[in-house]
Amino acid sequence: MNWWTNNKGEFNKLAKLTGPILVAQLTQMLMSVVDTVMAGRKGALDLAAVSVGGSIFVPATLLVFGLALALAPIISHLDGSNSHRRIANILQQGLYACAIVGVITLIGMSSAPWLLDIMEVEDDFRAITLDYLFYISWGIPGFVIYAVLRNFCEGLSNTMPSLIIGFIGLLINIPANYIFVYGKFGMPELGGAGCGLATAIVLWGMALSMVVYTFTAKRYKRLRLLRRWYRPNWDDVTYVIRIGFPISMSLFFEVSLFAAVALLIAPLGPTVVSAHQIALNISSLVYMVPLSISMAVTLRVGFALGAGNPKNAMLSFKLAMLFGGVFAGVNGLIMYLGGGWLASLYTPDKDIINLAATLMGLAAIFTVSDTFQAISIGTLRGYKDTKYPMILAFISYWPFGLTVGYILGLTDWVVPAMGAAGFWIGFISGLSVAAVLLSLRLRRVSRRYERKHFREQLNSAA
């Protein structure tokens, strides 16, 4: 009880950061749901085109998002050390870095026709998908601006703008989809491609909202963000890239793992694919909580280290683990006991419900491993340690997790082929290995920081 009383203040700070981030993440998921519903009501071809287009767009933008995420711990370090004069420069250098990568993303998306040719899709399907990508690509500059400014605000422990502007984006998204998908109010009827145009408008709306807030908020006036425009400093730009690129790749390894499994189980039939998708959809929704805790602990750890308090950094980690562990335990129990009921919300098909319920039982364990690895990697980002976590994530997800899943799911080498359940055991194995390896890495990094801080105290005392 005494331990809790002493540390309640830090827990409250962590919770206050986590809440708005969670709501912001959920609004982004809801935008995707709106796209899916609007396109689905238009037709199966439009829905499929939006799905494939999104599968190209999202991985393409991970590089920008990863670089922007690097700004949060960098700025939180500066905030903790009261180095506020350097924040305006690092914000602008981060914008340069993300802008460069944004151009690369646009160039990469130009390969979409080639990818669709390899897939040998129908002409109508190809046309809608390419139109979707054409329209949504206009939103990439807005996405760059929004991502940079969002992480600037969050780096200063101000997460409310993410929440409010997330709602603004959702409020723009619903009518914009309705207008452009169905051709209302004199606008052309674009079908699934209209979702791309709506998303581009949303991204620009969120970017402009974030610009207005950032450069008019009284709390940022002392930072003098517009007093001087800094030229690109390649040392600072490469510094952001050096921290952010491994974050981007870690995200890519995780996203691509789930995409690869979806392709591998596709030949097992629609029942298996549908059950897998239901379990994955629910798990993805649940993951928003540990993801938000992870992003919040990055900020608290970065601030503590900037303030020269490595012990408080590890306290934030322990409290995040406590918070995440309780959530994972309760949520895992709900998923295990109520898996069938949750699956029935998606479909009336008994075969799909039964298989999904089995997968949900595995997803309950998966959630625990996922929570611990997410919080560990978020804490390491607070230490600005991203290179080795990227390597550990790759080893855990691909050579280990996917291999275990493939052997158990599609071969008889160990047990009779388990289908989708085998791949979910692979997910659990990979994420559990990641959680252990990342925890060991964190232990090493945190001790190094504590030794360094101790030596600095001795030197200052001398």
From Swiss-Prot:
Its main location: membrane. One of its GO terms (molecular function) is antiporter activity. GO terms for biological process: monoatomic ion transport. It is found in: Cell inner membrane. It is a multi-pass membrane protein. Coiled coil: none annotated. CDD domains: MATE_NorM_like. The chain crosses the membrane at residues 56-78, 90-112, 127-149, 161-183, 193-215, 243-265, 285-307, 319-341, 356-378, 391-410, 420-442. InterPro entries: MATE_fam (IPR002528), MATE_MdtK (IPR050222), MdtK-like (IPR048279). Pfam families: MatE. Keywords: Antiport, Cell inner membrane, Cell membrane, Ion transport, Membrane, Transmembrane, Transmembrane helix, Transport. GO terms for cellular component: plasma membrane. PANTHER family: FMN_FAD EXPORTER YEEO-RELATED, MULTIDRUG RESISTANCE PROTEIN NORM-RELATED. Belongs to the multi antimicrobial extrusion (MATE) (TC 2.A.66.1) family. Multidrug efflux pump. This is Probable multidrug resistance protein NorM.
